[in-house]
Regions:
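Small-residue-rich helix-loop
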Residues: 2-100
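C-terminal terminal-structure detector
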Residues: 102-134
Length: 134
């Protein structure tokens, strides 16, 4: 029962962690990253969730740029995303231009390459990314 509670807590907090990163709340993001690590989450998983959120934001921003008056339900259907994900992410896309989101995604790609080629530790690179983004 305790293990199940910890898994649910980790799942809830992973989304809060990603949101804190996206909105640039470094203090909260670092705290939630450490919480995730303490709960046993691997940096690879944390990284994949960060990448996933920025990929969603890029898709949404691109569609929003092409169809400014699109409803959130239509956007969810067009992008094959759950309506809750779209509604939760909609305010976030207004914080970034498509070019800015692409730049952030390129930074994430560079981080992934450095990790996979052994140039730097993924944990350190995630922390650096969060620090620079905020």
């Amino acid at each position: 029962d305790v293990q199940l509670f910890l898994e649910e807590k980790a799942d809830d907090n992973i989304f809060n962690m990603v949101d804190a990163i996206v909105v640039g709340n470094r203090k909260l993001a670092f705290k939630l990253i450490e919480d995730q690590r303490r709960l046993g989450q691997e940096d690879g998983y944390l990284f994949s969730m960060i990448v996933r959120q920025f990929r969603i934001l890029i898709s949404m921003r691109d569609l929003f740029n092409r169809e400014e008056n699109i409803s959130s339900d239509s956007m969810a259907k067009a992008l094959e995303l759950h309506p809750f994900v779209v509604k939760k992410s909609l305010p976030l896309i207004k914080r970034f231009s498509l070019d800015k989101l692409k730049d952030i995604y390129k930074q994430l790609l560079d981080l992934d390459i450095k990790t996979k080629t052994g140039l730097a530790d993924q944990s350190w690179l995630i922390d650096l990314f969060v620090g620079k983004l905020g």
